[in-house]
């Protein structure tokens, strides 16, 4: 009797990656790393004067009994202020350096605490990768495993725009703390869940709370730093995110051996230690404190929120369940794509025509579509994140299948990439703000990322010629590829991506009007998470479909349910039941299909490289002396 599970298993993109338990560590990361996004961040530091102008105007109109809105007169005054003389601009820049009220050790604690929330969210994205089989065994609910990943993604993405808009009209401190509490409460639900349904609910709310923490962190760092310091501080977010992402599976694997529930309780322990800092040291920032709650909520685009939530949900579900839980041509997947298209069209019409909202209150910054620099930054952010995060996910999977690595070993294999990525992010934050140019970072980074991903991919015949292969049917990346080759390309990839993967958050704040800064950072967040989600979805689809078809040929006696159970990692130590020859063929089939996933990565790098050629050559982040 077969030792494999024989359940009819629906799997999301993520679960169909694990062939056996020892080879599954990073597989479930394919959908668990979804960098958070937000929308409509409150006015960042450079718009501080415009914000007060807007508040003063609103206060005057409110006291006169008029409708509290930003009038055309206020917009005109704002434009005049943004075109002041160079001397006036220099004076504002000089005064802006002292806007922060927290300095010294309290400021250090504040930065560490908000960055720690990013670390927890990144950790929660990937820590679940190693505990999926344990959860399935405890709850005896293999059929619902896909929702552990999809629910987390839906919970976060669904509130992208609505939550970001709330940050623009409510007190930043308390909305951030509310997001922290929601994330912690959801972690408690996941840890104490009595069944799979409760676990899924906890994952959904954890995704929503985590994105709220990310948006709040970006806001707090932006409004409390000057133009000169902001790139350096925002680069720390990418650094912490990368560290948390890599450590997630390692920590998850450790808890699986003890009790998987502590993978969620860990958030509560760290959160309890940091909560006093969040509560007492976080500065309050209220964009419209003089307005009543009803007046503030009247600025919220409820129709846009409903449409965006529906559009995101119906887009994520078919991408994740297509080809695994359901066939791509099934009625369910087709219906979801159709509904998604209709909702996106409705959202576009509603936003462009400002139906049931106003130009100042709508969810999406439609005006950015006419800004060349903003659109190029959006494209580059989406493309470069896809180019770097696809390898971050698939390189560990490669080592698990080809070398039999576990959680710790496969994480160590990523160190060349992560170390160079984090180091370059920090260097970029310092040097870009010092010299003022951003175009070279994107251009050189695109070249490096393209070269690295091309050599990690199966290219016929280009890659074969470059490495003097004579057999064009042999991929550069196969089960016997030298580790030194891979480490070298990892380092090159990290060196290239680090210069631009996080830079867009700071750059876009210099290329849009001050009155639009509330939209600017969230605009890049949408590109970042969209690029990661789309890139991983496409790469995993290439890998999963190819690997599944190959294994069906090699293992024709296995039923679909048994094959899916083995691939997902819930079917036991499957490879150990195979003879040596079949085991080698299975590993080769998986690795060869995995190499094809890097096509998505080098395509993203190519798009980023081409888009970077259109950037302006002007200097930004000018020092006060230079501005004068």
Swiss-Prot record:
Q: Which UniProt keywords apply?
A: Cell membrane, Membrane, Transmembrane, Transmembrane helix, Transport
The record's PANTHER family line, in alphabetical order, gives: MAJOR FACILITATOR SUPERFAMILY, MAJOR FACILITATOR SUPERFAMILY (MFS) PROFILE DOMAIN-CONTAINING PROTEIN-RELATED
Entry-linked Gene3D superfamilies: MFS general substrate transporter like domains
* Superkingdom: Eukaryota
Name this polypeptide is given: Phomenoic acid biosynthesis cluster MFS-type transporter
What is the role of this chain?
MFS-type transporter; part of the gene cluster that mediates the biosynthesis of phomenoic acid, a long chain aliphatic carboxylic acid that does not appear to be essential for pathogenicity but may play a role in allowing to outcompete other fungi in the environmental niche via its antifungal properties. Is probably involved in the efflux of phomenoic acid.
A Pfam family: MFS_1
Q: Name one GO cellular component term.
A: plasma membrane
Membrane topology according to the record: Multi-pass membrane protein
Return the similarity comment.
Belongs to the major facilitator superfamily. TCR/Tet family.
Q: Where in the cell is it found?
A: Cell membrane
Q: List the InterPro entries hit by this protein, alphabetically.
A: MFS, MFS_dom, MFS_trans_sf
Cell membrane found in the keyword field: yes
Q: What induces its synthesis?
A: Expression is positively regulated by the phomenoic acid biosynthesis cluster-specific transcription regulator C6TF.
What gene makes this protein? MFS
Membrane-crossing residues?
102-122, 150-170, 174-194, 204-224, 232-252, 262-282, 302-322, 329-349, 375-395, 407-427, 435-455, 488-508, 524-544, 595-615
GO MF, any single term? transmembrane transporter activity
């Amino acid at each position: 009797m077969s030792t494999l599970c024989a359940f009819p298993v629906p799997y999301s993109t993520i679960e169909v990656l694990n062939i056996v338990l020892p080879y599954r560590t990073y597989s479930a990361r394919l959908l668990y790393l979804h960098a958070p996004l937000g929308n409509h961040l409150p006015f960042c530091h450079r718009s501080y004067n415009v914000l007060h102008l807007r508040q003063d105007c609103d206060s005057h109109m409110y006291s006169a009994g008029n409708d509290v809105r930003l009038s055309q007169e206020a917009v005109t005054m704002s434009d005049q202020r943004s075109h002041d003389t160079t001397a006036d601009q220099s004076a504002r820049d000089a005064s802006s350096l002292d806007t922060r009220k927290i300095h010294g050790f309290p400021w250090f604690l504040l930065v560490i605490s908000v960055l720690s929330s990013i670390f927890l969210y990144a950790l929660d994205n990937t820590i679940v990768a190693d505990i999926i089989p344990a959860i399935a065994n405890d709850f005896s609910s293999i059929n619902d495993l896909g929702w552990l990943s999809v629910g987390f993604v839906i919970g976060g993405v669904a509130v992208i725009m609505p939550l970001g808009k709330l940050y623009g009209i409510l007190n930043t401190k308390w909305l951030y703390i509310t997001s922290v509490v929601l994330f912690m409460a959801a972690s408690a639900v996941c840890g104490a869940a009595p069944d799979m349904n409760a676990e899924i609910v906890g994952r959904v709310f954890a995704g929503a709370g985590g994105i709220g923490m990310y948006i709040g962190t970006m806001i707090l760092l932006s409004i409390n730093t000057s133009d000169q310091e902001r790139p350096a501080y925002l680069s720390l977010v990418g650094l912490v995110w990368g560290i948390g992402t890599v450590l997630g599976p390692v920590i998850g694997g450790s808890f699986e051996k003890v009790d998987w529930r502590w993978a969620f309780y860990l958030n509560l322990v760290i959160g309890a230690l940091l909560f006093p800092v969040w509560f007492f040291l976080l500065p309050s920032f209220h964009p419209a404190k003089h307005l009543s709650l009803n007046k503030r909520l009247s600025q919220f685009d409820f129709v846009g929120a409903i449409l965006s939530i529906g559009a995101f949900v119906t887009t994520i579900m078919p991408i994740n369940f297509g080809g695994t839980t359901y066939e791509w041509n099934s009625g369910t997947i087709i219906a979801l794509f159709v509904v998604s298209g209709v909702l996106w069209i409705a959202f576009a019409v509603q936003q462009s025509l400002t139906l049931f909202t106003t130009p100042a209150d709508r969810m999406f910054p439609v005006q950015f579509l006419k800004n060349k620099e903003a659109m190029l930054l959006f494209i580059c952010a989406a493309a470069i994140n896809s180019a770097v995060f696809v390898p971050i996910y698939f390189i560990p999977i490669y080592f698990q299948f080809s070398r039999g690595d576990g959680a710790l070993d496969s994480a160590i294999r990523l160190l060349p990439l992560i170390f160079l990525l984090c180091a370059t992010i920090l260097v970029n934050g310092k040097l870009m703000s010092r010299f003022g140019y951003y175009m070279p970072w994107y251009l050189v980074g695109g070249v490096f990322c393209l070269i690295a991903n091309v050599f990690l991919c199966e290219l016929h015949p280009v890659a074969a010629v470059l490495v003097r292969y004579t057999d064009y049917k042999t991929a550069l990346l196969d089960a016997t590829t030298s580790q030194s080759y891979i480490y070298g390309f990892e380092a090159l990839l990290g060196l290239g991506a680090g210069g631009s993967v996080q830079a867009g958050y700071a750059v876009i704040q210099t290329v849009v009007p001050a009155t639009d800064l509330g939209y600017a950072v969230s605009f890049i967040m949408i590109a970042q998470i969209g690029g990661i989600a789309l890139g991983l979805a496409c790469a995993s689809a290439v890998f999963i479909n190819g690997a599944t078809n190959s294994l069906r040929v090699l293992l024709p006696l296995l039923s679909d349910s048994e094959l899916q159970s083995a691939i997902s990692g819930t079917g036991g130590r499957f490879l150990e039941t195979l003879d040596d020859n079949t085991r080698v063929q299975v590993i080769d089939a998986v690795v060869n299909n995995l190499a094809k996933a890097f096509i998505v990565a080098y395509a993203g790098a190519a798009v980023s490289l081409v888009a970077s050629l259109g950037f302006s050559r002007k200097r930004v982040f000018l020092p006060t002396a230079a501005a004068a």
